[in-house]
Amino acid sequence: MRVAIPLTGTRGDVQPAVALGLELVGRGHEVVVGAPPNLVGFVERAGLKAQTCGPDVQQLYSSEAGQRALAAGSSFRLMRLVGEQMAEYADRMNREVIEVCEGAEVIVSTMLTEDRAHPVATAMGVPLVSMHGFPCRSNGAYPFPGALPPHWSPPAMVNRASWALAENLRRLVFARYLNRLRRELGLPPTMASTAAQMARDGVPEVQIYDPALVPGLPQQWGSRRPFVGFLPLERAAREAVGELATEHADVVSWLEADEPPVYFGFGSMPIRDTGAVLGMVERVCAQLGVRGLVSAGWSDLDVADARTDSRVKVVVGPLAHDLVFPRCAAAVHHGGIGTTFESLRAGLATLVCSVSFDQPMWGGQVERLGVGAHVSFARLTEDLLTEGARRILRPEVGQRAREFATRLQSHADATVRTADIVEKTAARA
Protein backbone atom coordinates (compact mmCIF):
# COMPACT_ATOMS: atom_id res chain seq x y z
CA MET A 1 0.00 0.00 0.00
CA ARG A 2 1.29 3.46 -0.91
CA VAL A 3 0.92 5.96 1.94
CA ALA A 4 1.40 9.70 1.43
CA ILE A 5 2.12 11.94 4.42
CA PRO A 6 2.16 15.65 3.45
CA LEU A 7 3.58 17.77 6.28
CA THR A 8 4.53 21.31 7.13
CA GLY A 9 5.66 23.13 10.26
CA THR A 10 8.61 22.68 12.60
CA ARG A 11 10.44 19.50 13.59
CA GLY A 12 7.96 19.02 16.43
CA ASP A 13 5.16 18.89 13.85
CA VAL A 14 7.05 16.53 11.54
CA GLN A 15 8.69 14.04 13.91
CA PRO A 16 5.59 12.09 15.07
CA ALA A 17 4.58 11.52 11.44
CA VAL A 18 8.09 10.27 10.68
CA ALA A 19 7.71 7.76 13.53
CA LEU A 20 4.44 6.60 11.96
CA GLY A 21 5.99 6.40 8.51
CA LEU A 22 8.80 4.17 9.75
CA GLU A 23 6.29 1.84 11.42
CA LEU A 24 4.32 1.59 8.17
CA VAL A 25 7.48 0.89 6.16
CA GLY A 26 8.29 -1.87 8.65
CA ARG A 27 4.91 -3.41 7.82
CA GLY A 28 5.77 -3.52 4.14
CA HIS A 29 4.05 -0.35 2.95
CA GLU A 30 5.52 2.28 0.63
CA VAL A 31 5.66 5.67 2.34
CA VAL A 32 6.46 9.09 0.92
CA VAL A 33 6.68 12.12 3.20
CA GLY A 34 6.27 15.71 2.13
CA ALA A 35 8.38 17.94 4.37
CA PRO A 36 9.47 21.60 4.53
CA PRO A 37 12.77 22.21 2.72
CA ASN A 38 14.70 22.61 5.97
CA LEU A 39 13.45 19.21 7.22
CA VAL A 40 13.74 17.06 4.08
CA GLY A 41 17.22 15.99 5.21
CA PHE A 42 15.90 15.08 8.67
CA VAL A 43 13.21 12.85 7.15
CA GLU A 44 15.68 11.18 4.77
CA ARG A 45 18.26 10.57 7.51
CA ALA A 46 15.53 8.97 9.60
CA GLY A 47 15.03 6.48 6.76
CA LEU A 48 12.05 7.68 4.71
CA LYS A 49 11.58 8.93 1.17
CA ALA A 50 10.96 12.68 1.23
CA GLN A 51 9.78 15.42 -1.11
CA THR A 52 9.66 19.15 -0.52
CA CYS A 53 6.27 20.31 0.74
CA GLY A 54 5.42 23.68 2.19
CA PRO A 55 7.50 26.67 3.26
CA ASP A 56 10.40 26.82 5.69
CA VAL A 57 8.44 27.74 8.83
CA GLN A 58 11.62 28.08 10.86
CA GLN A 59 12.73 30.81 8.46
CA LEU A 60 9.35 32.51 8.86
CA TYR A 61 9.51 32.41 12.65
CA SER A 62 13.11 33.65 12.59
CA SER A 63 12.21 36.65 10.42
CA GLU A 64 11.68 40.06 11.98
CA ALA A 65 7.90 39.81 11.48
CA GLY A 66 7.85 36.28 12.86
CA GLN A 67 9.89 37.23 15.91
CA ARG A 68 7.53 40.14 16.63
CA ALA A 69 4.49 37.87 16.34
CA LEU A 70 6.04 35.21 18.57
CA ALA A 71 7.14 37.78 21.13
CA ALA A 72 3.60 39.18 21.25
CA GLY A 73 2.33 35.75 22.28
CA SER A 74 -0.83 36.05 20.15
CA SER A 75 -2.20 32.98 18.32
CA PHE A 76 -4.42 35.21 16.19
CA ARG A 77 -1.47 37.40 15.17
CA LEU A 78 0.50 34.30 14.21
CA MET A 79 -2.50 32.96 12.29
CA ARG A 80 -2.57 36.20 10.31
CA LEU A 81 1.18 35.92 9.64
CA VAL A 82 0.78 32.35 8.42
CA GLY A 83 -2.15 33.49 6.28
CA GLU A 84 0.04 36.15 4.69
CA GLN A 85 2.71 33.56 3.99
CA MET A 86 0.09 31.27 2.46
CA ALA A 87 -0.93 34.08 0.10
CA GLU A 88 2.62 34.04 -1.26
CA TYR A 89 3.06 30.27 -1.19
CA ALA A 90 -0.49 28.94 -1.73
CA ASP A 91 -0.33 27.77 -5.34
CA ARG A 92 3.10 26.24 -4.90
CA MET A 93 2.06 24.31 -1.80
CA ASN A 94 -1.11 23.15 -3.57
CA ARG A 95 1.09 21.60 -6.26
CA GLU A 96 3.48 20.11 -3.73
CA VAL A 97 0.71 18.41 -1.74
CA ILE A 98 -0.79 17.03 -4.96
CA GLU A 99 2.63 15.72 -6.03
CA VAL A 100 3.31 14.08 -2.66
CA CYS A 101 -0.09 12.36 -2.74
CA GLU A 102 0.16 11.16 -6.34
CA GLY A 103 -0.63 7.45 -6.52
CA ALA A 104 -1.43 7.17 -2.80
CA GLU A 105 -3.94 4.62 -1.55
CA VAL A 106 -4.32 6.43 1.77
CA ILE A 107 -3.25 9.91 2.91
CA VAL A 108 -2.14 10.83 6.43
CA SER A 109 -2.18 14.52 7.37
CA THR A 110 -1.69 16.65 10.43
CA MET A 111 -3.76 19.58 11.60
CA LEU A 112 -1.43 21.83 9.57
CA THR A 113 -1.96 20.00 6.26
CA GLU A 114 -5.48 18.56 6.49
CA ASP A 115 -6.97 21.67 4.81
CA ARG A 116 -5.25 20.59 1.60
CA ALA A 117 -5.05 16.85 2.19
CA HIS A 118 -8.82 16.50 2.56
CA PRO A 119 -9.80 17.92 -0.86
CA VAL A 120 -6.92 16.02 -2.47
CA ALA A 121 -8.11 12.77 -0.87
CA THR A 122 -11.69 13.55 -1.92
CA ALA A 123 -10.70 14.17 -5.53
CA MET A 124 -8.56 11.02 -5.62
CA GLY A 125 -11.23 8.90 -3.94
CA VAL A 126 -8.85 7.65 -1.25
CA PRO A 127 -9.26 7.69 2.55
CA LEU A 128 -7.70 10.26 4.86
CA VAL A 129 -6.44 9.96 8.44
CA SER A 130 -5.37 13.08 10.35
CA MET A 131 -3.12 13.34 13.41
CA HIS A 132 -3.72 16.09 15.97
CA GLY A 133 -1.01 17.06 18.45
CA PHE A 134 -3.37 19.14 20.59
CA PRO A 135 -7.14 19.60 20.93
CA CYS A 136 -8.04 21.40 17.70
CA ARG A 137 -11.75 20.71 17.51
CA SER A 138 -14.65 22.38 19.29
CA ASN A 139 -15.34 21.13 22.80
CA GLY A 140 -16.78 22.36 26.06
CA ALA A 141 -13.82 21.40 28.24
CA TYR A 142 -11.14 23.75 26.87
CA PRO A 143 -11.11 26.97 24.83
CA PHE A 144 -9.27 27.45 21.56
CA PRO A 145 -5.54 27.62 22.46
CA GLY A 146 -4.50 31.21 23.02
CA ALA A 147 -8.02 32.63 22.80
CA LEU A 148 -8.40 33.10 26.56
CA PRO A 149 -5.94 33.38 29.47
CA PRO A 150 -4.77 29.82 30.27
CA HIS A 151 -5.61 30.15 33.97
CA TRP A 152 -9.28 30.85 33.21
CA SER A 153 -11.82 28.05 33.63
CA PRO A 154 -14.77 29.35 31.60
CA PRO A 155 -18.08 27.51 31.25
CA ALA A 156 -18.58 25.11 28.35
CA MET A 157 -20.61 27.66 26.40
CA VAL A 158 -17.71 30.15 26.41
CA ASN A 159 -15.23 27.45 25.41
CA ARG A 160 -17.38 26.43 22.45
CA ALA A 161 -17.83 30.07 21.45
CA SER A 162 -14.05 30.55 21.33
CA TRP A 163 -13.80 27.60 18.94
CA ALA A 164 -16.57 28.94 16.73
CA LEU A 165 -14.81 32.31 16.50
CA ALA A 166 -11.41 30.79 15.75
CA GLU A 167 -12.76 28.32 13.19
CA ASN A 168 -14.68 31.05 11.37
CA LEU A 169 -11.61 33.28 11.31
CA ARG A 170 -9.49 30.43 9.99
CA ARG A 171 -12.11 29.56 7.38
CA LEU A 172 -12.29 33.16 6.14
CA VAL A 173 -8.49 33.52 6.00
CA PHE A 174 -7.89 30.32 4.04
CA ALA A 175 -11.10 29.83 1.99
CA ARG A 176 -9.87 31.69 -1.09
CA TYR A 177 -6.69 29.63 -1.38
CA LEU A 178 -8.39 26.32 -0.62
CA ASN A 179 -11.17 26.93 -3.14
CA ARG A 180 -8.49 27.63 -5.72
CA LEU A 181 -7.12 24.16 -4.94
CA ARG A 182 -10.61 22.65 -5.18
CA ARG A 183 -11.10 24.16 -8.63
CA GLU A 184 -7.76 22.71 -9.73
CA LEU A 185 -8.92 19.30 -8.48
CA GLY A 186 -12.31 19.57 -10.21
CA LEU A 187 -14.25 20.01 -6.95
CA PRO A 188 -16.94 22.65 -6.37
CA PRO A 189 -16.07 25.58 -4.07
CA THR A 190 -17.25 25.48 -0.48
CA MET A 191 -17.47 27.79 2.50
CA ALA A 192 -17.70 24.86 4.93
CA SER A 193 -14.78 24.53 7.31
CA THR A 194 -12.35 21.65 6.93
CA ALA A 195 -13.45 20.38 10.35
CA ALA A 196 -17.08 20.24 9.20
CA GLN A 197 -16.18 18.48 5.96
CA MET A 198 -14.04 15.91 7.76
CA ALA A 199 -16.81 15.26 10.30
CA ARG A 200 -19.26 14.75 7.43
CA ASP A 201 -16.92 12.22 5.82
CA GLY A 202 -16.08 10.43 9.08
CA VAL A 203 -12.34 11.05 8.80
CA PRO A 204 -10.44 9.56 11.79
CA GLU A 205 -8.67 12.26 13.82
CA VAL A 206 -6.01 10.55 15.92
CA GLN A 207 -5.08 12.46 19.09
CA ILE A 208 -1.32 11.97 19.48
CA TYR A 209 -1.10 13.28 23.04
CA ASP A 210 -1.93 11.73 26.38
CA PRO A 211 -5.53 11.84 27.66
CA ALA A 212 -4.23 12.41 31.19
CA LEU A 213 -3.20 15.91 30.06
CA VAL A 214 -6.78 16.83 29.15
CA PRO A 215 -9.18 15.51 31.81
CA GLY A 216 -12.78 15.50 30.63
CA LEU A 217 -12.02 15.77 26.92
CA PRO A 218 -11.95 12.07 25.91
CA GLN A 219 -15.46 11.69 27.34
CA GLN A 220 -16.74 14.45 25.02
CA TRP A 221 -15.31 12.91 21.87
CA GLY A 222 -16.23 9.58 20.34
CA SER A 223 -14.32 6.80 18.62
CA ARG A 224 -13.51 8.99 15.59
CA ARG A 225 -10.97 10.82 17.79
CA PRO A 226 -9.00 8.09 19.57
CA PHE A 227 -6.29 9.09 22.06
CA VAL A 228 -3.13 7.08 21.41
CA GLY A 229 -0.43 9.13 23.15
CA PHE A 230 2.76 10.71 21.82
CA LEU A 231 4.57 9.02 18.90
CA PRO A 232 8.32 8.73 19.63
CA LEU A 233 11.13 8.03 17.19
CA GLU A 234 12.72 4.61 17.55
CA ARG A 235 16.34 4.45 18.67
CA ALA A 236 17.77 3.62 15.22
CA ALA A 237 16.11 6.68 13.69
CA ARG A 238 17.23 8.89 16.55
CA GLU A 239 20.81 7.76 16.07
CA ALA A 240 20.51 8.43 12.35
CA VAL A 241 19.36 12.03 12.87
CA GLY A 242 22.06 12.74 15.47
CA GLU A 243 19.86 12.77 18.55
CA LEU A 244 22.08 10.20 20.27
CA ALA A 245 25.37 11.59 19.00
CA THR A 246 28.67 11.20 20.82
CA GLU A 247 28.35 14.74 22.20
CA HIS A 248 25.75 13.34 24.59
CA ALA A 249 28.48 11.48 26.46
CA ASP A 250 29.92 14.84 27.49
CA VAL A 251 26.48 16.11 28.52
CA VAL A 252 25.71 12.98 30.55
CA SER A 253 29.13 13.18 32.21
CA TRP A 254 28.45 16.79 33.22
CA LEU A 255 24.98 15.88 34.48
CA GLU A 256 26.29 13.11 36.69
CA ALA A 257 29.24 15.08 38.05
CA ASP A 258 27.12 17.02 40.55
CA GLU A 259 23.54 17.48 41.74
CA PRO A 260 20.75 17.29 39.10
CA PRO A 261 20.36 20.63 37.28
CA VAL A 262 17.34 22.56 36.09
CA TYR A 263 16.83 22.08 32.35
CA PHE A 264 16.22 25.26 30.30
CA GLY A 265 15.03 24.50 26.75
CA PHE A 266 14.57 27.46 24.44
CA GLY A 267 13.20 25.60 21.41
CA SER A 268 11.63 28.18 19.08
CA MET A 269 11.50 31.00 21.61
CA PRO A 270 12.07 34.45 20.04
CA ILE A 271 15.42 35.29 21.64
CA ARG A 272 16.71 38.67 20.51
CA ASP A 273 19.54 39.10 23.00
CA THR A 274 21.43 35.86 23.59
CA GLY A 275 23.78 37.32 26.16
CA ALA A 276 20.93 38.76 28.20
CA VAL A 277 19.04 35.45 28.27
CA LEU A 278 22.09 33.44 29.28
CA GLY A 279 22.93 36.02 31.91
CA MET A 280 19.40 35.76 33.27
CA VAL A 281 19.65 31.97 33.48
CA GLU A 282 23.00 32.24 35.27
CA ARG A 283 21.63 34.69 37.83
CA VAL A 284 18.50 32.62 38.45
CA CYS A 285 20.59 29.49 38.97
CA ALA A 286 22.96 31.34 41.29
CA GLN A 287 20.09 32.79 43.31
CA LEU A 288 18.45 29.37 43.71
CA GLY A 289 21.72 27.53 44.25
CA VAL A 290 21.20 25.10 41.35
CA ARG A 291 23.01 24.09 38.19
CA GLY A 292 21.47 24.79 34.79
CA LEU A 293 21.50 22.87 31.50
CA VAL A 294 20.60 25.14 28.57
CA SER A 295 19.40 23.56 25.31
CA ALA A 296 19.34 26.07 22.45
CA GLY A 297 17.18 24.07 20.03
CA TRP A 298 16.85 26.04 16.77
CA SER A 299 16.49 29.39 18.49
CA ASP A 300 18.98 32.14 17.80
CA LEU A 301 20.95 31.21 20.91
CA ASP A 302 24.60 31.09 19.88
CA VAL A 303 26.97 28.91 21.87
CA ALA A 304 29.73 31.36 21.00
CA ASP A 305 27.95 33.86 23.23
CA ALA A 306 27.67 31.36 26.07
CA ARG A 307 30.01 33.02 28.52
CA THR A 308 28.73 30.90 31.37
CA ASP A 309 30.27 29.63 34.58
CA SER A 310 30.85 25.94 35.26
CA ARG A 311 27.40 25.54 36.83
CA VAL A 312 25.59 26.38 33.59
CA LYS A 313 26.18 24.27 30.47
CA VAL A 314 24.91 25.23 27.00
CA VAL A 315 24.11 22.61 24.35
CA VAL A 316 23.29 23.43 20.71
CA GLY A 317 21.60 20.92 18.41
CA PRO A 318 19.43 17.83 18.90
CA LEU A 319 19.17 16.64 22.49
CA ALA A 320 17.81 13.28 23.64
CA HIS A 321 15.28 14.25 26.28
CA ASP A 322 14.89 10.71 27.56
CA LEU A 323 18.62 10.60 28.34
CA VAL A 324 18.76 14.05 29.88
CA PHE A 325 15.48 14.56 31.77
CA PRO A 326 15.84 11.65 34.22
CA ARG A 327 19.08 13.29 35.35
CA CYS A 328 17.48 16.72 35.92
CA ALA A 329 15.71 18.22 38.94
CA ALA A 330 13.07 20.20 37.00
CA ALA A 331 12.42 21.53 33.50
CA VAL A 332 11.79 24.96 31.97
CA HIS A 333 10.75 25.03 28.30
CA HIS A 334 8.38 26.50 25.70
CA GLY A 335 5.59 23.95 26.11
CA GLY A 336 5.58 22.11 22.79
CA ILE A 337 3.71 18.84 23.25
CA GLY A 338 6.76 16.64 22.58
CA THR A 339 8.94 18.35 25.18
CA THR A 340 6.02 18.66 27.61
CA PHE A 341 5.28 14.96 27.34
CA GLU A 342 8.94 14.01 27.84
CA SER A 343 9.47 16.25 30.88
CA LEU A 344 6.27 15.02 32.55
CA ARG A 345 7.00 11.39 31.62
CA ALA A 346 10.34 11.80 33.41
CA GLY A 347 8.46 12.99 36.50
CA LEU A 348 9.86 16.53 36.30
CA ALA A 349 7.95 19.50 37.64
CA THR A 350 7.76 21.79 34.62
CA LEU A 351 7.70 25.56 34.06
CA VAL A 352 6.21 26.34 30.65
CA CYS A 353 7.25 29.68 29.11
CA SER A 354 4.75 29.57 26.27
CA VAL A 355 5.13 31.44 23.00
CA SER A 356 1.94 30.74 21.05
CA PHE A 357 -0.32 28.21 19.30
CA ASP A 358 -0.98 25.24 21.61
CA GLN A 359 1.79 26.10 24.08
CA PRO A 360 -0.31 28.37 26.36
CA MET A 361 -2.85 25.57 26.68
CA TRP A 362 -0.23 23.03 27.73
CA GLY A 363 1.23 25.57 30.15
CA GLY A 364 -2.19 26.13 31.64
CA GLN A 365 -2.74 22.39 31.95
CA VAL A 366 0.61 21.83 33.66
CA GLU A 367 -0.33 24.48 36.22
CA ARG A 368 -3.93 23.27 36.58
CA LEU A 369 -2.78 19.69 37.17
CA GLY A 370 -0.45 20.87 39.93
CA VAL A 371 2.71 19.55 38.27
CA GLY A 372 4.32 22.86 37.39
CA ALA A 373 3.78 26.49 36.50
CA HIS A 374 3.17 28.66 33.46
CA VAL A 375 4.20 32.11 32.28
CA SER A 376 3.93 33.69 28.86
CA PHE A 377 7.33 34.16 27.24
CA ALA A 378 6.18 37.62 26.16
CA ARG A 379 5.92 38.56 29.86
CA LEU A 380 9.01 36.71 31.07
CA THR A 381 11.31 38.66 33.38
CA GLU A 382 14.11 37.56 35.65
CA ASP A 383 11.82 37.84 38.66
CA LEU A 384 9.10 35.72 37.02
CA LEU A 385 11.65 33.11 35.90
CA THR A 386 13.09 32.97 39.41
CA GLU A 387 9.64 32.69 40.96
CA GLY A 388 8.59 29.97 38.51
CA ALA A 389 11.79 27.97 38.93
CA ARG A 390 11.54 28.21 42.71
CA ARG A 391 7.98 26.93 42.51
CA ILE A 392 8.80 23.85 40.44
CA LEU A 393 11.70 23.02 42.78
CA ARG A 394 9.35 22.72 45.76
CA PRO A 395 9.31 19.13 47.06
CA GLU A 396 5.51 18.86 46.98
CA VAL A 397 5.34 19.96 43.33
CA GLY A 398 8.06 17.49 42.40
CA GLN A 399 6.20 14.73 44.22
CA ARG A 400 2.98 15.49 42.32
CA ALA A 401 4.93 15.45 39.04
CA ARG A 402 6.40 12.04 39.84
CA GLU A 403 2.95 10.70 40.72
CA PHE A 404 1.48 12.17 37.54
CA ALA A 405 4.16 10.41 35.47
CA THR A 406 2.70 7.07 36.53
CA ARG A 407 -0.66 8.08 35.02
CA LEU A 408 0.72 8.76 31.55
CA GLN A 409 -0.05 5.85 29.27
CA SER A 410 2.85 3.95 27.79
CA HIS A 411 3.95 5.57 24.55
CA ALA A 412 5.49 2.31 23.34
CA ASP A 413 2.33 1.30 21.47
CA ALA A 414 1.20 4.75 20.30
CA THR A 415 2.86 4.40 16.91
CA VAL A 416 1.57 0.84 16.51
CA ARG A 417 -1.99 1.89 17.33
CA THR A 418 -1.84 4.79 14.87
CA ALA A 419 -0.52 2.52 12.12
CA ASP A 420 -3.35 0.09 12.87
CA ILE A 421 -5.86 2.92 12.39
CA VAL A 422 -4.29 3.85 9.05
CA GLU A 423 -4.43 0.25 7.82
CA LYS A 424 -8.01 -0.31 8.99
CA THR A 425 -9.16 2.97 7.43
CA ALA A 426 -7.58 1.98 4.12
CA ALA A 427 -9.11 -1.50 4.29
CA ARG A 428 -12.62 -0.07 4.77
CA ALA A 429 -12.35 2.23 1.77
Report each predicted region and the residues it spans.
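Nucleotide-activated sugar donor-binding and catalytic core shared by glycosyltransferases
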Residues: 1-32, 38-46, 158-172, 176-185, ...
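Generic beta-sheet signal
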Residues: 34-36, 53, 110, 131-134, ...
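Short loop/helix-cap segments at secondary-structure boundaries that form the rim of catalytic
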Residues: 39-46, 118-123, 141, 214-223, ...
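Short gly/pro/ser/thr-enriched loop/turn and capping motifs at secondary-structure boundaries
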Residues: 39-41, 57-61, 130, 134-141, ...
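A short helix->loop->beta-strand "cap" motif at the edges of active sites that frequently abuts
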Residues: 48, 124-127, 203, 290, ...
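Phosphate/nucleotide-donor binding subsite
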Residues: 49-106, 160-164, 172, 176-178
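Conserved nucleotide-sugar donor-interacting segment of glycosyltransferase catalytic cores
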Residues: 88-159, 211-214
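Donor-nucleotide binding loops and adjacent catalytic segments primarily
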Residues: 209-330
